[in-house]
């Protein structure tokens, strides 16, 4: 956004991060447009507690994109997506993915609709709804959740959206031993994958869960 330019160092950090993750450098311009829009709106609407654009690159964009190698083409519902994380970065990086951004907060949903419009993301749509109220049972190949509840809680509110054979991809910090043990009957962990996010010191794990 020309009226709210990001420092050159922000673009450099993103480009270096994409390179270290083996992702296409062509993703940088649309990701920076999204970041500039998020930074601008955040000043008024408090969409995220992270204010520094440099930190947003690491903790929002690169963290979201760390799961990209595990996402398949098809349909995906991003539950409790907030301002569109990881859903919008994944929609940018995966043109064969149809992303539904599920968020009940009105101001965050309005921001995402504007971001989708400005970015021309034909493979993303916003569902302003709580996950448990979304009447699209069995509609999705994949569910994602990055900062939403325990594994059992995610399954409880969003499990109905997953088609038979579909998977939940949940981003977690440290290895979630207790959460895995508390999954409802029929839900099984297929894999827990440690993730490396450039510039992020803390542990990150992607938990892949299959339904009954």
UniProtKB/Swiss-Prot annotation:
Recorded catalytic activity of this chain's protein: guanosine(527) in 16S rRNA + S-adenosyl-L-methionine = N(7)-methylguanosine(527) in 16S rRNA + S-adenosyl-L-homocysteine
Keyword rRNA-binding: no
Keyword hit for Protein biosynthesis: no
InterPro entries, A to Z: rRNA_ssu_MeTfrase_G, SAM-dependent_MTases_sf
Entry's Gene Ontology molecular function annotations: rRNA (guanine-N7-)-methyltransferase activity
Chief location of this protein within or outside the cell: cytoplasm
One Pfam family recorded for the sequence: GidB
Superkingdom, taxonomy of origin: Bacteria
Enzyme class: transferase
GO cellular component terms listed in the entry, alphabetical order: cytosol
Record EC number: 2.1.1.170
Function as written in the Swiss-Prot or TrEMBL entry: Specifically methylates the N7 position of guanine in position 527 of 16S rRNA.
NCBIfam families in the record: rsmG_gidB (TIGR00138)
Family membership noted in the UniProt record: Belongs to the methyltransferase superfamily. RNA methyltransferase RsmG family.
Full protein name: Ribosomal RNA small subunit methyltransferase G
Taxonomic lineage from the root: Bacteria, Pseudomonadati, Pseudomonadota, Gammaproteobacteria, Lysobacterales
The gene coding this protein: rsmG
